[in-house]
Amino acid sequence: MLYPIFIFILAGLCEIGGGYLIWLWLREGQCSLVGLIGGAILMLYGVIATFQSFPSFGRVYAAYGGVFIIMSLIFAMVVDKQMPDKYDVIGAIICIVGVLVMLLPSRA
């Protein structure tokens, strides 16, 4: 179970990091090179997600969505210095429970 978690985290870092660089370029006036690097990192995210050991594309991306939410809240705390409120935390917990329901049961 460690390998899928590692892939989810690596994919999340690429998606959030790449998206943030594009945000900086288009919304904060950073140079276009920042945006190009962000785009390249986002492309890498798409490749990394294919390394998951789960056979179903839809299930992998649905489960990853829950992980992405948690990582986005952590990113907001660390980078943007914006603390999640109780509704953010409750929603994130619900998402992680959903991820576990999707991924943990063995299927025939």
Swiss-Prot record:
GO cellular component, one term: plasma membrane
Record's keyword terms, sorted: Cell membrane, Membrane, Transmembrane, Transmembrane helix
Pfam families, alphabetized: UPF0060
Subcellular location: Cell membrane
Residue spans crossing the bilayer: 5-25, 31-51, 60-80, 86-106
Name recorded for this polypeptide: UPF0060 membrane protein SAB2216c
KW Transmembrane (keyword) present: yes
